């Protein structure tokens, strides 16, 4: 009832009005691929999303809890607040920040100039800042295990990225022949030397 015996006012809702979805930490969303593929991601802290590996089981929290993340990316909350990415499983507890904390360190690494990023050896900390990694060995371990943070300023390019690299990640991303065989001979040599330093058998890969 309205206070002090006041009258109720008519509330008019425009059915065409865009309603913002809830920002739900720990919830799981579906990203539609370009060729019918489906990718499932969980919203973690700092606008970071963990992309699940292939699922074995029903679409429920129990199945996802037993499935590891294949890769990580950061993006703004626009696609979830606007319902572009469909929520398929609600968060068991969206207030449990510690439970949905993204990995403490994720490598700052890109395949178009691997030597540059390996020389820099920088990592994204969970606080959102970029720091020098404690050692090159640790940086290489992060890269080879797929603990790389991909930062996207728009959600539209994410399906294309996943279609290209999701399968056999991180090898599919690190060993990108389009980049390795392009550019000057000096550039190509630098990239193959990085692959060797990362522990890849160049003879079998190229």
Regions found by a protein language model. Name each.
Residues 78-206:
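Beta-strand-rich cores of mature extracytoplasmic or soluble domains
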Residues 61-89:
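Intrinsically disordered, low-complexity linker and terminal regions at domain boundaries
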Residues 1-3:
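Intrinsically disordered, low-complexity segments enriched in serine/proline and basic residues
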Residues 8:
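Cationic, low-complexity basic patches in intrinsically disordered or flexible, solvent-exposed regions
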